[in-house]
């Protein structure tokens, strides 16, 4: 277990930063390239532990993948060309890998066994396995398919019209990917619109996808044609530096090539509502995944209420939004965020526990948290509990805390942002 010590930043964070590739898009680019016909070149790929797990799983199924830093080439096998894996498919810490890949495995007529690390073993899989079983896949796991390891024998699927109880891009994507080889038209309806990277990328690979309000449909039997993918920077990773720029005195940061997919930009809307000073300059209008350069500087923030339709657009950013709220005048209420409980950790509990250790006034609710600003934070020993987003949030908190902050299990940040601590150090000089 590696520790990191964070010292207070006295002269602000200043400079330009290129945000590493979007994790969600990197996963999908590898998966879709693997089941497409032809060669896909991916630029801007995120070489973090999670996305490398996706590469290793598809290599295990016979796909020729070469990764060199942030560039990847995938020689696709087509939908029918994957080979039965001889070994267990290990997804590491990646919930995206196991859930999306389950949709592909469900439509493939071979046997596979999928597992991950201790965190994955606690995450609920029935939200994905139940609809896949309804389509005809034979899936089992611990506690009747609730937890990993999962065994999947796929093939011979029938399309379903599924109403998901949760707004989850992973659930939606698994069903749509299974639907690629199902008989009929597969439809998924959600309570709120979740991130739409799967729909956008399927269209880029030549699949016809229909969107009507909160429902997405696709017909089975469509083929994917290889295409080159340019991955923008990950807005979820950018969020830590957006908040840092706003709350650390004497800061001004320029974040380059930040993905601006409208299903992901809740953090931008929240910072604007809180009163942050920033500008957004679009750089690739017309691309299937829009991006922008964002300049942000130290700001006076105010407490707000966050809930409803915006929650799926910022679910991964809530830990660092909570930190921003500790430095805002007034009370911030975050509600309708039950999904925080089934992330790498129960993020309601971990955010409240760790920020409390630093002196924040924050309390948990059943579906979120209440933060009382403005708090003067004090350095302490805190823990990421193996959750990359908790680790990065605590590092930014350490920058404004009085005295040193020691983060236990700090290496967890490598899941999505391997160079995070180096970037932070560089901007603090």
UniProtKB/Swiss-Prot annotation:
Enzyme class: transferase
Pathways per UniProt: Metabolic intermediate biosynthesis; chorismate biosynthesis; chorismate from D-erythrose 4-phosphate and phosphoenolpyruvate: step 6/7
Main subcellular location: cytoplasm
The reaction(s) this protein catalyses: 3-phosphoshikimate + phosphoenolpyruvate = 5-O-(1-carboxyvinyl)-3-phosphoshikimate + phosphate
Any GO MF annotation of the entry: 3-phosphoshikimate 1-carboxyvinyltransferase activity
Gene3D superfamilies: Enolpyruvate transferase domain
GO BP, sorted A to Z: amino acid biosynthetic process; aromatic amino acid family biosynthetic process; chorismate biosynthetic process
Active site location: 316
Subcellular location: Cytoplasm
Bilayer-crossing regions: none
Family: Belongs to the EPSP synthase family.
Family matches, as HAMAP family: EPSP_synth (MF_00210)
NCBIfam families in the record: aroA
Designated name of the protein: 3-phosphoshikimate 1-carboxyvinyltransferase
Gene that specifies this protein: aroA
């Amino acid at each position: 277990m590696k520790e990191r010590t964070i010292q207070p930043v006295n002269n602000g964070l200043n400079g330009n930063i290129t945000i590493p590739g979007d994790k969600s898009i990197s996963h999908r680019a590898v998966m879709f390239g693997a089941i497409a016909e032809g060669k896909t070149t991916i630029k801007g790929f995120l070489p973090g532990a999670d996305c490398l797990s996706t590469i290793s799983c598809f290599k295990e199924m016979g796909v020729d993948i070469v990764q060199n830093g942030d560039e990847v080439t995938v020689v696709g096998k087509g939908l029918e060309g994957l080979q039965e894996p001889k070994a267990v498919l290990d997804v590491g810490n990646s919930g995206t890998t196991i859930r999306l890949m389950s949709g592909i495995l469900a439509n493939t007529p071979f046997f596979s066994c999928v597992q991950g690390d201790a965190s994955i073993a606690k995450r609920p899989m029935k939200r994905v396995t139940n609809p896949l079983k309804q389509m005809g896949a034979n899936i089992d796991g611990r506690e009747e398919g609730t937890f990993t390891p999962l065994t999947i024998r796929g093939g011979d699927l029938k399309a379903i019209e599924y109403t998901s109880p949760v707004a989850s891009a992973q659930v939606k994507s698994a069903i749509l990917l299974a639907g690629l080889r199902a008989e009929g038209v597969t439809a998924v309806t959600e309570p709120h619109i979740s991130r739409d990277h799967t729909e956008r990328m399927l269209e880029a690979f030549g699949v016809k996808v229909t969107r009507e309000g909160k429902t997405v449909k696709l017909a089975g039997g469509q083929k994917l044609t290889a295409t080159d993918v340019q991955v923008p920077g990950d807005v979820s990773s950018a969020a830590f530096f957006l908040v840092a720029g706003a709350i650390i005195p004497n800061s001004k940061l320029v974040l380059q090539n930040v993905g601006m997919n409208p299903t992901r930009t809740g953090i931008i809307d929240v910072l604007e509502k809180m009163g942050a000073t920033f500008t957004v300059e679009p750089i690739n209008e017309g691309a299937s995944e829009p991006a922008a350069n964002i300049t942000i500087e130290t700001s006076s923030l105010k407490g707000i209420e966050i809930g409803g339709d915006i929650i799926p657009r910022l679910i991964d950013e809530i830990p660092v939004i909570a930190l921003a709220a500790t430095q805002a005048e007034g009370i911030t209420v975050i509600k309708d965020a039950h999904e925080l409980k089934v992330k790498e950790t129960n993020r309601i509990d971990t955010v409240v526990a760790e920020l409390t250790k630093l002196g924040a006034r924050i309390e948990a609710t059943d579906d979120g948290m209440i933060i009382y600003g403005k708090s003067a934070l004090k350095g302490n020993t805190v823990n990421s509990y193996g959750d990359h987003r908790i680790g990065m949030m605590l590092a930014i908190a350490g920058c404004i805390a009085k005295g040193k902050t020691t983060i236990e299990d700090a290496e967890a940040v490598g899941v999505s942002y391997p160079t995070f601590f180096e970037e932070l150090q560089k901007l603090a000089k």
